[in-house]
Amino acid sequence: MAENYKLSEVPVGKTCKVKELKVKELLKQRILDLGMVPNTEVYVLRRSPWGDPTAYLIRDTCIALRKEEGDKIIVTMN
């Protein structure tokens, strides 16, 4: 069985799959609108020099999330 991680813990250059969103309703709707639904593959594109925010590639779209947001998205590594 695959191990669970916070999205913010996934190294740059790795791909993971969304398992669960542990966010409040307002942020949850924003994340869902961006296409980050369960079983969606997410590629960690790059981190800013200060480590926050991080750019992710989701369904051919680049989005940036802060660490505090990534901490609430549970993923499995591919």
Model features per residue range: what roles?
Residues L27-R30:
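Short alpha-helix capping/helix-loop boundary micro-motifs
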Residues E9, E20, V44-R46, M77:
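A residue-level detector for short acidic-glycine micro-motifs
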Residues V23-K24, R46-G51, C62:
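Short, charged beta-turn/beta-strand-edge "cap" motif at the junction between a beta-strand
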Residues K17, D33-G35, R46-P49:
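Charged, well-structured alpha/beta interaction segments
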Residues G51-N78:
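C-terminal structural segments of small proteins and small subunits
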